[in-house]
From Swiss-Prot:
Main location: membrane
Keywords attached to this entry: Antiport, Cell inner membrane, Cell membrane, Ion transport, Membrane, Transmembrane, Transmembrane helix, Transport
Protein name: Probable multidrug resistance protein NorM
Lineage, uppermost ranks: Bacteria, Pseudomonadati, Pseudomonadota, Alphaproteobacteria, Hyphomicrobiales
Record-level GO cellular component terms: plasma membrane
Taxonomic source organism: Rhizobium meliloti (strain 1021) (Ensifer meliloti)
C-alpha cells in the first residue's frame, strides 16, 4: 500500500518553496478553469432563454436559483470527500480512499432522493412565495426535467473530489470544457428548434442541463475506469457494501461546509434585496459589480481547492512543515492574483461597467455612475473574499469544518449584514454602504478563519496525524 504512493510521499517531502508554489498552481489553474467554465455554462442558459422573452427569462432565473440552492448544499458533502481522500492518500491508505469516495456517493444519492420532492413541487412553492403564476409554471416545467440532473451532478462532484485528492485536476477541466461546448450546442438546438428539432423553449434548456450533467458524470467514470493506476482503488466494486464510519464522517464534515456555503450565498441574495429597496438603478449597478466580483472569485476559489488537497496530503503523511508551506504558498498566490484584479478594478471601473451597458440608452449614464464606485470597492472586496475562501479551504484540508462554519456565520451575518444595513440606511451611504458592509464582513471572516488555521496548525504540529 505504501509502495503505491511512494512517489506521492516523496513529492510531499520536498518542501522547497518553488515546489509548493508550482504544485499549488498545477492544481489551482485547472480548478480555476473549471470554475470559469461552469460559470459560462450557467450564463449560456440565461442568455439563450432570455431571447424568448421576459417571462421565460424570469422563469429560468428563478428555476436555476432553486436548483442551485439545492445543489450547492449537496456539494458540501462532495467537498467533504476531498480532505478525506487527500489525508488517506497522504498516509498511503487506499482502502480509506475507496471507502470515503463510495460513501460520498451514497450520501449525495440519498440527499438527491430527499430533496427531489422540493424540486418536483417547485411551482406551488413559488406560487406560495408570491411569484406570478405564468413564471412559476414555466419554472416548475423546467425543474420537472432538470431535477434529475441533481444525481449525476453530485456524483460528478464526488468523483471530482476523488481525482482532486490524487492531484489529478487536469481531467476535471477537460470534462467541464466538453460539457460547456455540448451545453451551448444543445441549448441552441433544443431551445430554438434548429436542425429539424422541435422548438422546446425553456423545456429544451432543462433537457440540455440534464444531458450535460449525465455526460459529465459518464466521462469522469469512464476516465477513472480506463486509468490502470486507478484500478487499485476499486471504487465501483461491491458498491453496495456500506462503511458506516466513513458515511458518518462525510455527513459530519459535509454539513458545516454546506451551511457555510449557503450562509454566504444567502448573504449576497439578501444584499441584492437591500439594493432593490434603494432603487432600480442601484440594483442594476450592483448586479454589474457583483458579476465582476464573481468572475474574479473563481481564482481564489480554485486556489482554496488546491489548498485543501495540498494540506490534506501533507497532513496525512505527517509533514507539518509541508502543511505550513502549502498554506503560505496558496495564500501568497491568492493575494498576488487579487492585487492584480484589484488594480484593474480601481483603474478601469467605468470601462468595465460599460461592457454590460448599451450606452445609447437614456438610463445607461446613471447606471454607469453608480457602478463605477461599486467596482472600485469590489477590488477590496475580492481581496478579503479571496483570503477568507482560501482560509476555509486550508481548514478543510485539516478536516476542520464546524468551528469555521460558526466563525464564518458570525462574520457574514452579525457583522457583514448589520454593517451593510447600517451603512446603507441609518448612515445614509446607500448602495455604496451595502458594499462597505460586504467588505467588513468578509474581512472579519478572513481574519477569523486565518487565525483559526494557524492556531490549529500550532496545536496539531505537536501531535501530527502520522504519529
Amino acid at each position: 500500500m505504501l509502495t503505491a504512493t511512494k512517489d506521492l510521499v516523496l513529492a510531499q517531502s520536498d518542501n522547497s518553496w518553488p515546489t509548493h508554489f508550482r504544485a499549488s498552481l498545477y492544481l489551482g489553474v485547472p480548478f480555476i478553469g473549471a470554475q470559469l467554465a461552469q460559470l459560462a455554462i450557467n450564463t449560456t442558459d440565461v442568455l439563450m432563454v432570455g431571447q424568448l422573452g421576459a417571462t421565460q427569462l424570469a422563469a429560468i432565473i428563478l428555476a436555476t436559483q432553486v436548483f442551485f440552492t439545492i445543489f450547492i448544499f449537496g456539494s458540501g458533502f462532495a467537498n467533504a470527500v476531498v480532505p478525506m481522500v487527500a489525508q488517506a492518500q497522504g498516509r498511503g491508505d487506499q482502502v480509506s480512499v475507496r471507502r470515503s469516495v463510495r460513501m460520498g456517493m451514497w450520501v449525495v444519492l440519498l440527499y438527491g432522493v430527499l430533496t427531489a420532492p422540493v424540486l418536483w413541487m417547485a411551482e406551488p412553492i413559488l406560487l406560495f412565495a408570491g411569484q406570478k403564476p405564468e413564471v412559476a409554471a414555466l419554472a416548475g416545467e423546467y425543474l420537472h426535467i432538470a431535477q434529475w440532473a441533481i444525481f449525476p451532478s453530485l456524483i460528478f462532484m464526488v468523483l471530482r473530489a476523488f481525482l482532486s485528492g490524487l492531484e489529478r485536476a487536469g481531467v476535471i477541466l477537460y470534462v467541464t470544457l466538453v460539457t460547456l461546448v455540448l451545453n451551448a450546442a444543445l441549448c441552441y438546438v433544443l431551445i430554438f428548434g434548429h436542425f429539424g428539432f422541435p422548438e422546446l423553449g425553456i423545456f429544451g434548456a432543462a433537457v440540455a442541463a440534464l444531458g450535460v450533467a449525465l455526460l459529465g458524470a459518464a466521462l469522469t467514470i469512464g476516465y477513472i475506469r480506463r486509468q490502470p493506476e486507478l484500478h487499485r482503488f476499486e471504487l465501483f466494486v461491491r458498491f453496495w457494501r456500506p462503511d458506516w464510519p466513513a458515511f458518518g464522517e462525510v455527513v459530519h464534515l459535509g454539513i458545516p461546509i454546506s451551511v457555510t456555503i449557503l450562509a454566504e450565498v444567502s448573504l449576497f441574495t439578501v444584499a441584492s434585496l437591500l439594493m432593490g429597496t434603494i432603487g432600480t438603478i442601484e440594483l442594476a449597478a450592483h448586479g454589474i459589480a457583483l458579476q465582476f466580483a464573481s468572475i474574479a472569485f473563481m481564482i481564489p476559489l480554485g486556489l482554496a481547492q488546491a489548498g485543501t488537497v495540498r494540506i490534506g496530503l501533507a497532513y496525512g503523511s505527517g509533514d507539518m512543515v509541508g502543511v505550513k508551506r502549502a498554506a503560505i504558498a496558496v495564500l501568497t498566490l491568492g493575494v498576488g492574483f487579487a492585487a492584480v484584479g484589484s488594480t484593474i478594478f480601481a483603474l478601469f471601473p467605468h470601462e468595465l461597467a460599460g461592457l454590460y451597458l448599451d450606452t445609447r440608452r437614456p438610463d445607461a449614464a446613471e447606471v454607469l455612475a453608480f457602478a463605477g464606485p461599486l467596482i472600485v470597492i469590489a477590488g477590496a472586496f475580492q481581496l478579503v473574499d479571496g483570503l477568507q475562501a482560501i482560509a476555509a479551504g486550508m481548514l478543510r484540508g485539516l478536516k476542520d469544518t464546524t468551528i469555521p462554519m460558526i466563525l464564518a456565520m458570525i462574520a457574514y451575518w452579525p457583522i457583514g449584514f448589520f454593517c451593510a444595513w447600517a451603512f446603507a440606511f441609518p448612515l445614509g451611504f446607500g448602495g455604496v454602504g451595502v458594499w462597505f458592509g460586504f467588505v467588513l464582513g468578509l474581512a472579519s471572516a478572513a481574519l477569523l478563519l486565518n487565525w483559526r488555521f494557524f492556531r490549529l496548525l500550532r496545536r496539531v504540529s505537536a501531535a501530527p496525524a502520522a504519529s
